[in-house]
């Protein structure tokens, strides 16, 4: 396996979270982040052809839509066009705000960014510099191991993640 990694995340808030967790000291594997909804859209063939065999592909996706056909098709296409990959699933069961509240010492996500509303929180969170975001998460005692530990809805059982640090959670194809 090579040491390349690509993260496919649903939106800018997930992009910010992943980027912050990759800051030193790294809590996630370093790699490139692409904003792309793998549950609702098919990864373009041109992108897949640029992924080298042995790359770790991390799929961060929401589970609020019970339709998983595009996710399954993306997995088929990744294995067809990219050769041997390590694919890691990080399904998000709660919305980002709830997830951060569950994993930090705050009662509301707005406390993290001192925002006046949930909408402002998302805007403020996404606009933060990556290092500032990481510092804010550390200051509020983010428990990294709890981020992706919530049980997924039934439609997503195939992609259940017990722990991001559990060596058995990666699916190799």
Which residues fall in each region the model found?
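Conserved helicase/translocase motor-coupling segment
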Residues: 34-35, 39, 59
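Residues immediately flanking
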Residues: 11, 63
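Short hydrophobic beta-strand that contains or immediately precedes a catalytic carboxylate
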Residues: 6-10
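C-terminal accessory helical subdomains adjacent to catalytic cores in phosphodiester-
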Residues: 2, 15-30, 45-58, 65-173
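N-terminal polybasic phosphate/anion-binding patch
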Residues: 41-43
């Amino acid at each position: 396996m090579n040491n390349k990694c690509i993260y496919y995340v649903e939106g800018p808030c997930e992009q910010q979270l992943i980027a912050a967790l990759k800051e030193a000291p790294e809590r996630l594997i370093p790699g490139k982040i692409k904003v792309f909804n793998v549950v609702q859209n098919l990864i373009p063939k041109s992108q897949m052809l640029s992924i080298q065999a042995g790359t770790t592909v991390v799929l961060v996706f929401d589970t609020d839509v019970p339709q998983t056909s595009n996710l399954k098709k993306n997995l088929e296409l990744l294995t067809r066009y990219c050769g041997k990959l390590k694919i890691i699933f990080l399904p998000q069961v709660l919305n980002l705000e709830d997830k951060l509240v569950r994993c930090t010492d705050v009662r509301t996500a707005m406390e993290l960014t001192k925002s006046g509303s949930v909408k402002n929180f998302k805007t403020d969170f996404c606009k933060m510099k990556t290092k500032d975001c990481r510092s804010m998460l550390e200051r509020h005692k983010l428990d990294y191991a709890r981020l992706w530990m919530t049980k997924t809805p039934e439609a997503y059982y195939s992609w259940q993640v017990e722990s991001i640090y559990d060596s058995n959670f990666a699916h190799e194809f």
